[in-house]
Amino acid sequence: MCDELTEIDNESFSNGGGALSRRDFSKLSAAAIMSLMFPTNALGQEVVEKSDVMVNMRDGVSDCYYVRPSSGKHPAVLMWPDIKGLRPAFRAMGKRLAMQGYSVLVVNPFYRDAKAPVVGEGASFSDPETRKFLIAMARKLTQNASMADARAYIEFLDAQDNVDTNRKVGTLGYCMGGPLIMRTAGAVPNRVGAAASFHGGGLVSDADDSPHLLIPSSSAHVLHAIAENDDERGPDAKNV
């Protein structure tokens, strides 16, 4: 579950001087998951091209980061950041994945309200004003809105010359991105073949639009990487 306590846990862990930070773990995990789900892709260190792009959406224009190998056609990956949005850490994660042979679009989920980065370097979710600001934007990511966004992002990817549209799309989500990968898989089931969430929150609820209810609409292979504190706060979710 991705809530204010979890985010504070994340910051404490990342600042604790461990040998492997959550950021580094996520970078390694993302590459590993995509490699397993698309096993025929080479595990080389591709030379990449990167650019800031504007994607036309139903509700406006989304500023995104697009990074891909400098030659050839490659499977597409749609990356949803955590609640602090598109920022240098996620640009680095997208680049790392692109170096493994993927065309990666890292999106600004809050484009309706602000261009990325939506918070400054070092902003803490434990700060009340920062938390209030981010949560207000996150609440606008309803199922209807986020599924429309997913369709637009994948339409953008499929229109790129360096995307292999004969290969399925992968999607990754971090923290609040957990529900977004499920909605992506449900919104474009014929294109999304792999989905993974890390520390995802709000995957299961009693609401009529709970993300887990979209599972029958998806044909993707899915991995949810759940931490111990996630399970402690929502022990029944795994049994749904």
Give the role of each language-model region:
Residues 42-72:
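N-terminal cap/lid segment of alpha/beta-hydrolase-fold proteins
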Residues 88-107, 111-112, 117:
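Short amphipathic alpha-helix adjacent to the substrate-entry channel of hydrolases
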Residues 123-170:
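Gly/Ser-rich "nucleophile elbow"/oxyanion-hole loop immediately N-terminal to the catalytic nucleophile
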Residues 74-82:
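Short beta-strand element of the alpha/beta-hydrolase
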Residues 202-240:
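The feature captures the conserved acid-bearing segment of alpha/beta-hydrolase catalytic domains
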Residues 1-20:
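N-terminal secretory signal peptides
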Residues 20-35:
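N-terminal export leaders
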Residues 151-214:
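Primarily recognizes the serine-hydrolase "nucleophile elbow" in alpha/beta-hydrolase
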